[in-house]
A protein has these predicted regions:
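Residue-level signal for well-ordered, solvent-exposed loop/turn and beta-edge residues enriched
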Residues: 61, 153, 330, 372-374, ...
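Beta-propeller domain segments
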Residues: 80-82, 90, 160-332, 368, ...
Length: 455
């Protein structure tokens, strides 16, 4: 698999104790992937916006036969199409899975399907049972993320209905299902049941029974972090601010502020409740550097890469950067990955993390190398000459198994070698002139890094 390295630290002339992530190309040839999930087995299921669900095997091979094709039931284009997929917690026993799409009228549909009784890699296209049919006034702001929580309920996030500025004030209207987090019980003989602990459930309560939280603009993907008990919600801003919200899954009825506020900034507060009643984002970012639209991801809870543990991964669609939110709610960005507009993240059944690019049709696996402090103090290692042209020399390396890699300013690995001998030249004549970073790695965790100019 192809590896691409993105350094997420801000390099100065000497950096230690920094971190990097790798994107390994896992699968290619998909059409507009907008969701990645698993059915608690080794397969990945990828939702294509054109109405097709594909299966990817553990080696990255895409099954030739579609798992499901409902292209005739959807409208595909812009922000509309088949957008979400979730497998029932008892999928292995009942074969139920749920999809979120726009029908030809543009309405939001949440429907249940069943897997084939004879082939686990094919769904039964005739098994559709529609649970929700939500009209919406405009083409954009469709939301499109569904997940089961540990309570066994299906959680659904919707957009505010579209246009700009939420002209119908749907997100603040507790009797509209648009701009909301919904929560329903799908283990019902009818379409669904209302959980009795939903905040607006029951007669005489102002608000739709299905609503759990409100005040969302166009949340593009949410996920559950079961370690902390939060839903992580990435909400796309109006024109200036992108936001990340944490929603405790045991706290009902929260108002996330739109259209009254965009991020932490007042947007249109006419008729709004007091600011003190709003729940504001834990992190925001503006549109500097070509950023424009957040794509939500996951808190990493896998075991393979301990240095990523507890960090929330997301992306910006336009800047083609991956963002990482730490436990202090600080954001660090990778360098841009040009040509890949990241549209969704997903997990495998072992909590491995993946990201998809809607325009290139590629799925990448997120991996890492963690750079720590080398046993040799930085002052004992010398890299010379600098600038260099044909050769570079290194002195002071104590670990005979150390490896060297040269990373471009764009974060791409251009050279790697384990042939490091103190005082012996390393040929760099094939590397174009520019600014690079030379990393010495001792195993997986120990490293020295320095800026290198090649002329």
């Amino acid at each position: 698999m192809k590896k691409l390295l993105f350094c997420i630290s801000v390099f100065s002339s000497l950096i230690v104790n920094s971190q990097s992530i790798n994107l390994e190309e896992f699968a290619t040839g998909l059409t507009s992937p907008v969701e990645i999930t698993n059915a608690n087995d080794s397969r990945l299921f990828v939702v294509q916006q054109n109405g097709i669900i594909k299966i990817i095997q553990p080696n990255g091979t895409i099954n030739a036969t579609n798992f499901l094709n409902i292209g005739t039931k959807i409208i595909f284009g812009g922000e509309r199409g088949l957008l979400g997929l979730a497998f029932h917690p008892q999928y292995s026993a009942n074969g139920y899975f749920f999809v979120y799409y726009n029908n030809p009228s543009g309405n939001i549909i949440v429907a249940r399907y069943s897997v084939s009784s004879t082939d686990p890699n094919v769904a039964d296209p005739a098994s559709e049972k529609i649970l929700l049919n939500i009209p919406k006034p405009f083409d954009n702001h469709n939301g499109g993320s569904i997940h089961f929580a540990p309570d066994g309920k299906l959680w659904i996030i919707t957009g505010d209905g579209g246009s700009g500025g939420d002209p119908n004030n749907n997100a603040q209207n507790k009797n509209s299902l648009l701009g909301k987090m919904l929560r329903i019980d799908v283990d019902a003989t009818g379409p669904y049941n209302i959980p009795p602990d939903n905040p607006f459930a029951g007669a005489g309560v102002d608000g739709a029974d299905e609503i759990w939280a409100y005040g969302l603009r166009n949340a593009w993907k949410f996920s559950f972090d079961l370690t902390t008990g939060n839903a992580m919600i990435a909400d796309v801003g109006q024109g200036a601010i992108e936001e990340i919200n944490k929603m405790p899954i045991t706290t009902a009825g929260l108002n996330y502020g739109w259209r009254c506020y965009e991020g932490n900034n007042a947007y249109n507060t006419a008729g709004c409740a007091a600011q003190s009643t709003m729940t504001f984002p834990v992190a925001v970012y503006d549109h500097s550097g070509g950023k424009c639209s957040i794509t939500g991801g996951y808190v990493y809870r896998g075991t393979q890469y301990p240095s990523l543990q507890g960090k929330y991964f997301f992306a910006d669609y336009c800047s083609t950067q991956i963002g990482i939110l730490d436990s202090n709610n600080a954001i660090t960005w990778t360098t841009p990955y040009s040509g890949n507009n990241f549209s969704t993240f997903g997990e495998d059944y072992q909590k491995g993390l993946y990201v998809a690019a809607v325009n290139s049709g590629k799925i990448f696996k997120v991996t890492t190398g963690t750079l720590g402090t080398q046993e040799s103090s930085p002052g004992t290692i010398k890299v010379y000459p600098n600038p260099a042209s044909k050769e570079v020399f290194i002195d002071g390396v104590k670990d005979k198994k150390a490896t060297l890699e040269i990373i471009s300013a764009e974060g791409r690995k251009v050279m790697e070698t384990d042939q490091i001998i103190n005082g012996k030249g390393i040929n760099i004549s094939g590397i174009p002139a520019g600014v690079y970073y030379i990393n010495l790695k001792s195993g997986e965790l120990k490293s020295y890094s320095q800026k290198l100019i090649i002329k």
